[in-house]
Structure formats: structure tokens, C-alpha cells
Design a protein with these regions (language model features):
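Short conserved loop adjoining the S-adenosyl-L-methionine
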Residues: 163-169
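Hydrophobic/aromatic beta-strand patches that form the interior of the parallel beta-sheet core
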Residues: 4, 23-25, 157
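Conserved class I S-adenosyl-L-methionine
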Residues: 1-9
Length: 180
């Protein structure tokens, strides 16, 4: 009845058990936030999120921010870095002002992460970017594909697995630790 994926990564294994109660965990916050978007049961407004995404896609940002000051013309172009930085800050502002809930925040951050991945100037790994890269793609966010019929009791964690394992119970535990 309960499946725990305690090194859940991108959530591929957990998504195969959508008809069960899921417990996901990943120490990487970016993976955890995607798990919240895909697996956590919480009400959200799809129309609101799609409207925000459309607004973000039509943005033109000319002011610098953390992202542009630190990553311009490395993994992303200067323009995309400005846009990414603005969007990320705006998502947090909307969340802190209670304009969006935690599920909506997770949906927006997941959309941003996947849009960034599609245009990143890398060879598939983020340990280095391609020098003198050609930035011919631009940031385009889309609404994440989610299954709205997820179990009401699903739990998503961002904890050290060695500690978490003492606090959960499951009928099946999938363990695929990092091997890099």
C-alpha cells in the first residue's frame, strides 16, 4: 500500500506507483520541489499558474540580479539569466505574500527548472558549461505534466535518508543511492 523512494531523484520510480501512497525523499532541494509539484496533494489553480507562466514567458528584464551577476554568458545568456533571476525572485515574493500556495510555488519552480534545463549551455552535466557557447534558445516555461489524482497521503521529504528512514514506514522501499 505504501511505497517509499528514499533517493527519489527525478521521481521516475515513484511515478510508476501512482496508485499507492508515496513517500519521496531527495537531499537535493531542486528534486524535492519537483516531487511536491508532481506527488503532493494540495489544491491549486491551474488557470492561475498558466497565466503566471504566460506572463513570465512574455517578460523582458533589463535589470541585473543574482543570476545575471553570477552566471551570465556561462550556462545561460545574459538576457535569459536576467529573466531566470527575476522569475525566481518573483515566485518567492508571490509565495511570501500568500498569492500562491506551496503546491503552486512548486509548480512554478519546477516549470522554471525544466525550462532552464532545455536551454542550458552544457553537454548534459552542470559541472561545466561550454565556453564560447552559442545561445540560440530562449527560456520558455510550460505547465508541468502532473497527475491530479495523486494520493491524499503522499509525503515528500528533503532530508538525510539515514535520519528519515527511522521516521517512516512503507511496504516497499526503493533504494538507489547516488553513485557518482
Amino acid at each position: 500500500e505504501t511505497v517509499a523512494d528514499i533517493f527519489a531523484g527525478t521521481g521516475a520510480v515513484a511515478s510508476a506507483f501512482f496508485d499507492k501512497k508515496l513517500i519521496t525523499n531527495d537531499i537535493m532541494y531542486s528534486n524535492y520541489i519537483c516531487h511536491v509539484a508532481w506527488f503532493k496533494k494540495e489544491k491549486f489553480s491551474e488557470i492561475k499558474i498558466k497565466n503566471i507562466i504566460m506572463k513570465y514567458n512574455n517578460l523582458s528584464v533589463t535589470t541585473d540580479n543574482y543570476m545575471s551577476e553570477n552566471f551570465a554568458d556561462t550556462y545561460f545568456s545574459l538576457d535569459d539569466c536576467r529573466k531566470i533571476g527575476y522569475i525566481r525572485e518573483d515566485i518567492e515574493k508571490k509565495y511570501n505574500n500568500k498569492e500562491i500556495n506551496s503546491k503552486e510555488r512548486a509548480l512554478l519552480v519546477t516549470s522554471l527548472l525544466y525550462a532552464m534545463d532545455k536551454i542550458a549551455n552544457t553537454c548534459g552535466h552542470y559541472d561545466a558549461y561550454r565556453k564560447n557557447g552559442i545561445y540560440n534558445k530562449h527560456l520558455e516555461m510550460t505547465f508541468p505534466e502532473i497527475n491530479v489524482k495523486c494520493n491524499n497521503n503522499n509525503m515528500c521529504y528533503n532530508r538525510d535518508t539515514n535520519i528519515l528512514i527511522n521516521d517512516i514506514e512503507a511496504d516497499l522501499v526503493y533504494i538507489d543511492p547516488p553513485y557518482n
